[in-house]
UniProtKB/Swiss-Prot annotation:
This is Glutamate-1-semialdehyde 2,1-aminomutase 1. The modification N6-(pyridoxal phosphate)lysine is found at residue 268. Its cofactor is pyridoxal 5'-phosphate. Belongs to the class-III pyridoxal-phosphate-dependent aminotransferase family. HemL subfamily.
Length: 434
């Protein structure tokens, strides 16, 4: 497949953009390097690169593009609002409308506030939780990504009773000392952490369904136990639903799982492809936020009319009858086909799937936590990723990321993907990896 224009643009980008990309995951470091594909346009389940190559898209911009690229309802909403103005710095009717829709869809959101990204949303929920509880420490779960604010770029210590260590240059040891990281789905480790730090813990930060070391569901009773134990210690429970909200049903993963947090962070899908974040929760907690309370948060672009219009339109599309049933049906077809293709090529894999999101791990063991995901074979995934790319199938360039289906995918797309996967699994089986 010819990608000479992408190669030229990547060379050019490295002279003016740090690393040639505006987010590290785009640099293909997770698959052993290479030239990122520069895209020209998207249409439905496909996008087209600058050399004219077509790809079936399972990246979906790391999750937001659940409706497919350039959905006509969302495109029209953005175009109509652009003609009226995209930024005023004042309240608008659209903010009220969108906030009402979110609170209707996710009942735990008694009040909401809009921001510009998932990172901002998570960062602010932590600040508000600290203001509400008067405590400082945070407990989070290993392998779960919560954006790039300092407090959540912290790696686990040597055990649940030890404090974290910085996971990025520029994160101070003092900041890391405020975070305790425990394994997901390990309630005993969580109990141990609370035994040591519960009296100092402001909040527990949870992905109710993990999306950042693959799609990993909670073990039965795990989230309920986290809620009960956290509340007994006087800590709040924050759900990071930046990936999961509106991915598995019209609402949050919390509604799918029937577990209610105190606060929730949102992003990705709710923006319809434009930058957005939101956070919300119980009224008494949210009233800690300025101008009502002492916890400060502001933003020039927060609640901008362009993002509000796109978000309202996106949720309108997702309210259509049968949307999530279609995603589940296509996801099941893809999962079954991938298992058969891998078995035929004699390549062991394990797939975690929920509705229209799945992760293919190159391992023969089930993956229920970050350690299991880490043990999956990254070399094999790298070969598979590059083979699939040459077949015209675009995945996320990391063994930890999910495949995201959109409502624009068809059964023919799935079947084409399975055929390409079989050829790619054969490349893996041939041993073209170290």
């Amino acid at each position: 497949m010819n990608r000479k224009t992408s190669e030229s643009l990547y060379q050019e980008a490295q002279h003016v953009i740090v690393g040639g990309v505006n987010s590290p995951s785009r640099a293909y470091k997770g698959v052993g390097g290479g030239t990122p594909v520069f895209m020209e346009r998207g249409e439905g389940a496909y996008f087209y690169d600058v050399d004219g190559n077509r790809y079936i898209d399972y990246l979906a911009a790391y999750g937001p593009i659940i409706t497919g690229h350039a959905h006509p309802v969302i495109t029209k909403a953005i175009q109509d609002q652009a003609a009226k103005g995209v930024l005023f710095g004042t309240p608008t009717r659209l903010e009220n409308e969108f906030a009402q829709e979110l609170t209707n869809a996710i009942p735990s959101l008694e009040k909401v506030r809009f921001v510009n990204s998932g990172t901002e949303a998570v960062m602010t929920t932590i600040r508000v939780a600290r203001a509400y509880t008067g405590k400082e420490k945070i407990i989070k779960f290993a392998g779960c990504y919560h954006g790039h604010s300092d407090l959540v770029l912290v790696a686990a210590g040597s055990g649940p009773s030890t404090l974290g260590t910085p996971d990025s240059a520029g994160v101070t040891a003092a900041t890391a000392s405020e975070v305790i990281t425990v394994p997901f789905n390990d309630i005993e480790a969580f109990k141990e952490a609370l035994a040591h730090w519960g009296s100092e813990t402001a909040a527990v930060l949870v992905e109710p369904i993990v999306g950042n070391f693959g799609i990993v569901e909670p073990e039965p009773g795990f989230l309920e136990a986290v809620n009960d134990l956290a509340h007994s210690a006087g800590a709040l429970v924050i759900y990071d639903e930046v990936i999961t909200a509106f991915r598995f049903m019209y609402g949050g993963a919390q509604d799918y799982l029937n577990v209610k947090p105190d606060m929730t962070a949102l992003g990705k899908i709710i923006g319809g492809g434009l930058p957005i974040g939101a956070y919300g929760g119980r009224m008494d907690i949210m009233e800690q936020v300025a101008p009502l309370g002492p916890a400060y948060q502001a933003g020039t672009m927060a609640g901008n009319p362009a993002s509000m219009s796109a978000g309202i339109a996106c949720l309108e599309v997702l309210r259509t009858e049968g949307v999530y049933e279609k995603l589940d049906e296509l996801g099941a077809r893809l999962e079954e086909g991938l298992y058969l293709a891998a078995a035929k090529a004699n390549v062991p894999i394990s797939i975690n799937r929920l509705k229209g999101a799945l992760t293919v791990y190159f391992t023969d063991e089930p993956v229920i936590d970050y350690e299991g995901a880490k043990r999956s074979n990254g070399d094999q995934f790298s070969v598979f990723f590059k083979a699939m790319l040459n077949e015209g199938i675009h995945l996320a360039p990391s063994k930890y990321e999910a495949w995201f289906l959109t409502i624009a995918h068809t059964k023919n797309d799935i079947d084409e993907t399975i055929e390409a996967a079989y050829r790619s699994f054969k490349t893996v089986a041939a041993g073209f990896y170290s």
